[in-house]
Amino acid sequence: AASQVSPAIYERLILPRERRLVRGLKAMGAKVRMHICGNITHLLPGLASLGLDVIDVDHMVSLITVRKVLGPKVAMGGNLDPVADILRGTPDLIRARLARCYLDAGNPFMVNAGCEIPSATPAQNLLALCEPLAYTGS
């Protein structure tokens, strides 16, 4: 998980490889989506330098912070807690959390748990997660 990698190790060992990978994918015309489990807050400056199109954000990370660091063009997905919100929560809790995510992230944003959804998740919670959320703002 990202929370176990220091910024120094990330910048020295991982970021150069990610840069090469992202450059190669973009050279082929691909959009690039990054998924990193865990708290990536301390890695955001390096991630911002990659030119990502989409990033998945774990529930441990502030969407507001990610938006500030990565900017308005990167699509964000996340960041409901897969256990507390989706597995053990209620449809109403999920709807409320999604509304908060939209407010915090702004657009572009995709509904996502930020990590794997447990297989024992109640069907009504999955349906609530998949409901379209119409937010018009004020």
Predicted features by range, described:
Residues A1-S138:
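Active-site loop segments of alpha/beta catalytic cores
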